[in-house]
Amino acid sequence: MSTASPAPAAAPVSVPPRVAYELAARRHMTDAETLFTTGRLANAGQLYGFVAECGLKALMMACGIQADADGGIPGKRPAPTKGKHPLREHVPLLMTNITADFQIIPDGIQANKYLALVPNRNDFHDWLIDHRYWRDTALPIASINLWRVAAREITTMLDQAKQDGVL
C-alpha cells in the first residue's frame, strides 16, 4: 500500500482573450506595408483601414470601454441606453461615432490626448469595408497614400500610449 500523498491540483490556466486590438493593428500594418511596397495597393489599402479600426478600438478600450467576454468592444450600448454599441463599427463610421458619442468613453480626456496624435484620421472618409469586393479599377487608389499616412499616425499613437503605460 502506497503512502504517497495525492499530487497538488494544477493551477488554472489563464487564457488571454481572443480579441487583441493593438496586436491586430500592428499585424495589419506590417502586412499593409509589405503589400504597399510590392505594388499590391488594393489590399494594402484595405489593411490600412483595419489598422485604423483596430488602433482606435485599442485606444478606446484603454480609455475605459468595458470589454465583452472575447476582449472586444461589446455588441450592445452601455445601460441605460439600448441598441448596437456605437464603437462596434468599421472606419469611417467608427471615427464619426467616437466624436458623436464621446460621452460613452469613460476617460475622454485621455482619449483626446491620443486622438490629437492622429490629425489625419479623417482621411479614411472614403474607405469602405466593402472595398474588399470591388474591382481594382473601382477603388479610390488615389486615397491609399492618405490612408497610409493616417495608419502610420495611428501606430505612432499606439507606440506613445504603450510608452506612457496606457496600453
Where are the regions that the model predicts?
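Terminal alpha-helical segments
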Residues: 1-167
